Amino acid sequence: MDIWEKLYTQAKKEYHPEDVTPFVYAHHVVCALESADGTTYTGFCIEACSGVMNLCAERVTALNMYVNSGQTKIRRLIAFRDEAPSGGGSGMPCGACREFLYQLNEENENMEIMVNYETREIVTLKDLMPNWWGKERYEQSRL
């Protein structure tokens, strides 16, 4: 079993769309990541009618990693709905998630994101955001 199969299998366990209440819907998008130390974490999307409660699976998973380990650096990430990513944009983090992952740790620009599970095609966060606006702030923080 390669790392991508492990991540897919763990994330798939979280996939069971449900109405938590008449206002909150969850588990319809799932995610798993491998942290810098090799530990895997999972999460799921949760949405509420108010809109401000909505959290994508990628952000929930990254927050699970941070809350449970204090880590912020991610090696690999897979996200999907009912099937593994199959190219054409399926499984790609939204703009808010991309931004959060970059802000969480600048080294996350090198994290691998699954594009097509079957062919093992990946991209990096840097591929998705080649001219990220926050690099300058990270550089200034090191002065």
Range-by-range predicted roles:
Residues 29-30, 53, 91:
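Gly/Ser-rich catalytic serine loop of serine hydrolases
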Residues 25-36:
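Short beta-strand scaffold segments in enzyme catalytic cores
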Residues 45-59:
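Compact, glycine-rich, soluble single-domain proteins
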Residues 2-21, 71-143:
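C-terminal binding/interaction regions
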Residues 56, 60, 96-99:
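Short amphipathic alpha-helical face segments that pack within enzyme cores
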Residues 39-40:
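Hydrophobic "anchor" residues
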